[in-house]
Amino acid sequence: MNKKKTKICCIYHPQDEDEEGCTSDHQHDELPESSSSSSSESENDKDLGFDERRKRRVERRRRKLRDNTDSAPNAYEVQPDYSEHRKKMMEKKSNNT
């Protein structure tokens, strides 16, 4: 029951400077240079603010969804039609009685 509580740097930031915690020498708001952006993002998005990047990302998503509406749904998205099977079962049932 005597578990030591640990503070995780990227989640918890102490309010008092004299508290021991994470020595934050990194920036949470900036993306590291080594991480590559997704292939759908253009190079121009790097210089834009959060809201503008989000706006462009949403627009790309909407455009992609709009372009994909012509494609046929996959097998998991199509509800099977059992009406013929039901008719056969009803006929079989009525013939047996």
Curated annotation (Swiss-Prot):
Region (Disordered): 1-97
Residue spans of biased composition, Basic and acidic residues class: 43-53
Entry keywords, A to Z: Nucleus
Cell compartments where the protein resides: Nucleus
GO CC list: nucleus
Compositionally biased region (Basic residues): 54-65
Main location as per UniProt: nucleus
Family of this protein: Belongs to the YPI1 family.
Function: Regulator of type 1 phosphatases which maintains protein phosphatase activity under strict control.
Protein's name in the database: Type 1 phosphatases regulator YPI2
Source organism (scientific name): Vanderwaltozyma polyspora (strain ATCC 22028 / DSM 70294 / BCRC 21397 / CBS 2163 / NBRC 10782 / NRRL Y-8283 / UCD 57-17) (Kluyveromyces polysporus)
